[in-house]
Amino acid sequence: MEVENGTRENVEAVLKEMLQRKSFSKYKFVLISMHPEELRHLENRQVRVETRVWYGDSRKALRRFAWLKLRAAMIIDENLQIQKKASNTIHVYLSHGSPVKSIRESYNCTPDTDYMLSQAPFWNPINEYELRIPVERMVTLGFPRNDALFSDKSDLLNLFDQKFNKLVVWYPTFRQHRIHEAVIPQHSSFSIPLIHDEAAARRINELAAQYGILLVVKPHPVQDLSLIRELQLDHLIFIYDDFFVSNGITAHDFLGKTDALITDYSSIIFDYLLTGKPVALTIEDYEQYKEQQGFAIDFKMLKSCSTILDTPEDFAAFFRDLVEGNDPLKEKREEVMRLTNTYLDGNSTKRVVDWMEELLQRPR
């Protein structure tokens, strides 16, 4: 099982469900990660954590990795795929989100992928083109991670010291990589839409405070956070992957308890639509993205069901509507939600593991 921080919620949900079932007690689970130290707490007699191996590593490590792949009954991944070595191994790609941005030139399913989870039939031709995987290999059962959106972890809002009436989470797409240059060059030293300097950040913080909003920004895992970390504001705060780890929750546990989402070109929007809560988009660099990376979908669909934020005044109006309970785009969001999500019941993990259990019982 491939487990990487920031894109591991589907795999973790499946692992937890499997460990609870007697039918999986005969299997050993090997978690492969570039950051194994983050997963040591999961180890027991049935679960082992090992370091991801790459070409150029020691021969001993490469032989060990090859041996594990040869012995695997099933390979389960959702980001950095692990190619199988034995023809009777079942390779399932759980996906880490339905594509908004075009990824055809940067990310594809490996040819040995036997099955891929598709969020809904709507996505099948899109996944086929973007990920270069045949439609007949796609299975629609729902994303396991989305079950957490329906969970009842009522204590999550006690994770912050600030007092607030509404909690809004902001998921911006990365624009400034820690190592490489940004995919889309930005004039913002903060690398977040509409927050181009400290003054802009303070203005949005003031508006959030005015309406009793706690605005929590979750930057992309690979984004350069060096300047953002220096901000010390009371109603515009930043959280990182370690926030979820240290509090023993997943990103989707947290998402389910928020009151609204702000994002841009992230696939998280299609998951969040399941909550029925308001969504806003910050897309000031839309034309750049469209020209340089392109989109996997017709972006008009997202514009039609989301509030567009271009100025601080737009933030103020969005906050005001949220506090006053005005939701003019509710019906349109539901329409898009039903198009892009087949399952709305919070039982996707069970469905996926039931299906995997049946796969493993087939003659191979």
What are these regions (language model features)?
Residues 56-68, 72, 222-267:
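Donor nucleotide-activated moiety binding/catalytic core segment of transferases
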Residues 51-57, 237-246, 304-318:
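Short acidic-hydrophobic, aromatic-tinged amphipathic segments that line or gate anion-handling sites
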Residues 345-364:
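C-terminal alpha-helical cap of glycosyltransferases
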Residues 100-104, 111-195, 221-222, 324, ...:
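A nucleotide-sugar donor-handling region in carbohydrate enzymes
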Residues 1-150:
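Active-site and donor-binding regions of nucleotide-sugar-utilizing enzymes
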Residues 29-47, 170, 201-244:
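Catalytic donor nucleotide-activated moiety binding site of glycosyltransferases and closely related
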Residues 232-234, 267-340:
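Catalytic binding pocket for nucleotide-activated donors in carbohydrate/polymer assembly enzymes
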